[in-house]
């Protein structure tokens, strides 16, 4: 950080990122140098033979090229290791070494071309077998290196890099002029024109990346509009963020350690009455644990677990196979290509499943926990159009609509379309905003329910069992959770008694007025440090500021910072900035102040910078049950040794305003992990009851 500027343009790589590629090339070229030198010393070359003479001169030339390559690569590695992440002045001379390396590469390619010509013309007739075998191996190896180098250059190419350099040069000249003459020039029109030009270039670049990444999806009008919206969002988010991917990695490593130190300091100081943290959540005397000893709460929690099976079943056969690796053969009898021979009398309507109805088979296997009748299941998927199914749950006497979460590239596009959009209500409420992609998905499902008359069909499914009296329940996980919550709000006027269970919903889902309204009928479930409920656009802007603040505090080279988290499973030496903060409340308080200042600066940038678009905060829906882990200490008396105890607490929507960096931040989002954690909460409560009863009996 910042991005390397060579050849009059910015690149998506930092001057301190060249240590690893430089060391890799150095190792390969050193081995090649040894092989060539050994072949020149050991083998006798009869220069009276033209083919041997040409080979000898080729090897001598390449030995010189390798020598210069090794020298330049040593220089690049040494220079690249200098200074901290932000101290690019210590690496200013890296540009000269890159230009030298580029020149050496040109000589290398020229030599490879001549060597390839020699192979095509003289390889068969050259009477020196061992030397020419080494020669062809070196040729192949170096062509491979050239190909890898070109791929790397293509990956680090910044399409808007030249415009960026011009804009920065202009801003620098403006600041120098203002400083020299001690006045501020009003030249906003020219400045804004340059900024718009850069932003347009970056938006086009992101649009191109989206089209390349999702090239298999076709180029429909809906997809093109989605690409444009996402490109605008991403270019806006990364505006004037002069970082490269490795900076983000180093920032995440530091931020995780800073967050841990901050939590330790809060507990040590008993700030706000906090006496411990569970899964990153501050626990105080006011924390509301779900009282599962109460029969009503216990039954409600069992209902939460019950409907998690519906949310998991919507994922179809991929999730079933992941969860049941040793039992996936159980699906075979349920497949259509086999089941049709057995005279299956299933009258469910299944839309756009695969040829063997694998998804529907997995759904039926997942829902074998009660008396459940599947009425309708669609696996059609497009941008803003999510698969779902409708079922009659005779066990709970409910009509269940379950919506699938993210599973395809089209689902990812729906997720990324994260701008706020007004919910389509009658009468309209301008302050009720929702995640744009999920609003579109909810409208699609609502229209489908109305066009196919699905809710009415489910209510009339079995008059003898009074299905017409059943209430409506909406469930979903991840993308499905967000869509289900918005759909519940849309259907609430027509179905006043409906309920919604939203598992691992996205953080940037609803504006606060809509969240407050939803608390009476939506229950959300979040596991541990799950990142998805914490990554709304507003939270991402805070994360952006926190990463920059963490990087600014770093005094170590980037390679050392990153290696601290990977050497010996994270057992390497701690970064210097972390060591300086450890146990020092003054330094931690200073860090907190700097973090607040960084967030404020991000929200209110200076006039000379490219202002960020401020996004209205969006939050997870409804009342939130947060499943947290308590890792027992060695001196604690626990029921199961070394196993964390899972507990459920009531959380507020505003509690998920910060991304917690953790190895489990992605794992905690998986539906099977959520279901397992919910069951462990009940299991731990049951074990505690059994232990108490045993003690009472013994006494």
Q: Where are the regions that the model predicts?
A:
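Non-catalytic, mobile gating and regulatory segments of ester bond hydrolases
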Residues: 2-475, 479-699
């Amino acid at each position: 950080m910042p991005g390397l500027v060579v050849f009059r343009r910015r690149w998506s790589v930092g001057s301190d990122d060249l240590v690893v590629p430089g060391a890799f090339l150095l190792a390969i070229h050193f081995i090649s140098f040894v092989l060539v030198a050994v072949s020149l010393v050991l083998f006798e070359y009869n220069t009276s033979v033209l083919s041997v003479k040409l080979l000898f001169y080729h090897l001598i030339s390449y030995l010189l090229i390798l020598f210069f390559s090794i020298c330049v690569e040593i220089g690049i590695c040494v220079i690249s290791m200098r200074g901290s992440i932000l101290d690019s002045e210590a690496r200013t001379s890296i540009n000269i070494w890159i230009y030298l390396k580029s020149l050496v590469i040109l000589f290398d390619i020229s030599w490879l071309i001549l060597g390839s010509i020699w192979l095509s013309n003289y390889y068969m007739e050259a009477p020196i077998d061992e030397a020419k075998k080494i020669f062809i191996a070196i040729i192949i190896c170096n062509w491979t290196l050239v190909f890898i180098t070109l791929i790397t250059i293509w990956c680090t190419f910044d399409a808007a890099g030249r415009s960026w350099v011009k804009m920065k040069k202009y801003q620098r000249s403006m600041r120098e002029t203002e400083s020299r003459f001690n006045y501020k020039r009003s030249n906003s029109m020219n400045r804004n024109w340059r900024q718009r030009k850069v932003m347009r270039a970056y938006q086009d670049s992101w649009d191109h990346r989206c089209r390349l990444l999702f090239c298999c999806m076709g180029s429909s009008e809906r997809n093109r509009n989605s690409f444009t919206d996402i490109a605008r969002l991403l270019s806006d988010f990364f505006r004037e963020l002069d970082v490269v991917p490795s900076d983000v990695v180093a920032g995440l490593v530091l931020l995780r350690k800073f967050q841990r130190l901050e939590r330790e300091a809060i507990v040590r100081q008993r700030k706000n009455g906090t006496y411990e943290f569970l899964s990153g959540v501050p626990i105080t005397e006011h924390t509301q644990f779900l009282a599962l000893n109460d029969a009503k709460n216990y039954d409600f929690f069992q209902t939460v677990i019950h409907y998690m099976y519906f949310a998991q079943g919507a994922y179809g056969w991929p999730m079933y196979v992941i969860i049941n690796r040793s039992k996936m053969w159980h699906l075979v009898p349920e497949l259509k290509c086999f089941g049709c021979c057995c005279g299956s009398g299933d009258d469910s309507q299944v839309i756009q499943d695969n040829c063997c109805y694998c998804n529907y088979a997995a759904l039926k296997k997942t829902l074998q926990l009660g008396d459940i009748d599947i009425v309708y299941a669609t696996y059609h998927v497009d941008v803003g159009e999510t698969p779902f199914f409708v079922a009659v749950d005779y066990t709970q006497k409910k009509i269940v609509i379950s919506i699938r979460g993210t599973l395809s590239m089209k689902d990812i596009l729906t997720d990324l379309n994260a701008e706020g959009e007004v919910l389509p209500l009658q009468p309209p409420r301008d302050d009720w905003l929702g995640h744009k992609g999920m609003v579109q998905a909810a409208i699609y499902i609502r229209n489908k329910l109305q066009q196919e008359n699905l809710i009415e069909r489910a209510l009339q499914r079995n008059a003898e069992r009074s299905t017409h009296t059943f209430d409506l329940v909406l469930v979903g996980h991840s993308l499905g959770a967000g869509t289900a919550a918005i759909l519940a709000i849309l259907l609430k006027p027509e179905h006043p008694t409906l309920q919604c269970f939203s598992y691992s919903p996205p953080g940037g889902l609803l504006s606060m007025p809509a969240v407050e309204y939803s608390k009476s009928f939506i229950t959300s479930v979040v596991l541990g440090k799950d990142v998805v409920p914490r990554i709304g656009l507003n939270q991402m802007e805070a994360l952006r500021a926190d990463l920059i603040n963490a990087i600014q505090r770093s005094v170590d080279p980037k390679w050392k910072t990153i290696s601290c988290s990977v050497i010996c499973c994270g057992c390497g030496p701690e970064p210097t900035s972390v060591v300086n903060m450890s146990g020092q409340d003054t330094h931690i308080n200073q860090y907190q102040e700097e973090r607040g200042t960084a967030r404020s600066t991000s929200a209110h940038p200076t006039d000379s910078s490219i202002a960020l678009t401020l996004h209205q905060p969006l939050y997870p829906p409804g009342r939130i049950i947060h499943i947290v882990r308590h890792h027992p200490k060695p001196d604690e008396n626990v029921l199961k040794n070394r196993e964390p105890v899972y507990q459920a607490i009531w959380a507020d929507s505003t509690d998920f305003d910060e991304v917690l960096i953790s190895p489990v931040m992605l794992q905690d989002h998986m539906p099977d992990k959520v279901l397992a954690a919910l069951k462990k909460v009940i299991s731990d409560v049951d074990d505690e009851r059994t232990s108490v009863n045993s003690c009472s009996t013994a006494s």
